[in-house]
Amino acid sequence: MCIRDSNNDMCRSRMAQEILNSFGRGMKVSTAGILAGNSVPDVVCQVMEQNGYDFSRRKPCDVATYAQQTWDYVITLCPEAEEVQKEMQSVVRKYVSFNFTDPFQGGIHVEDEQEERVRALYDIMHKELYEFFRSELMEKLLPRCSCGANTYCRCE
C-alpha cells in the first residue's frame, strides 16, 4: 500500500500488485492506498503494458476496504503509508516496508521525463520485490512432497 502520489493519482501499489502477481501462483495480492487517488496515470499504464502487465481493469482502492481482514503480510511502499500499521495491528502477521519514491514528485510535465521516472521506478520495484519474494515467500509457495521436501524429490 502507498499514499496517494503527488499528482493525486495512484500507481506504486498497483505496480507492486502486478509485479508480485507475476512471480507465481499461490498468492493473493491486493492493493490499497491511504488517500487513494482517482485513477492510474496513462504513463504508468504505458510503462507497465510495455513490460507485459494489463492495467486496464483495476481501479484504485482505499485501505479501509481491507482494514478488517486478516493478512499474512502488509507491504508499505513509502514511509507515509506506515501510519496504517497502528490501525491494522491486530489483523496483520508481518509488515514489510519499502521506500519507493513518488515518480510525480516535483510536478514534472515533460512526458519523456515522466516516462523515464516511471520506468526507473518499475526497475527498482521489480528488483526489490523479487528479492522480497525470493527470501520471504517462494519457499512457502513451492509444492511439498509427503517427505517434507519443498522441491521435487525422488522418494516415490
Model-found features: residue ranges?
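Phosphate-binding/catalytic loops
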Residues: 85-148, 152, 156
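Structural signal for conserved beta-strand scaffold positions within catalytic alpha/beta enzyme cores
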Residues: 31, 76, 96-99
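Conserved active-site segments centered on acidic
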Residues: 4-65
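Disulfide-bonded cysteines in secreted/extracellular proteins and peptides
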Residues: 2, 6, 11, 78, ...
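Cytosolic catalytic domains that perform sulfur/thiol-centered chemistry
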Residues: 66-77, 118, 147, 153
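Mid-chain, well-packed structural core segment of small domains
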Residues: 69-94
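Residue-level detector of flexible, active-site-proximal loop/helix-junction positions
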Residues: 36, 81, 102-104
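Short glycine-/acidic-enriched loop or helix-start segments at secondary-structure transitions
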Residues: 14-16, 41, 83-87, 107
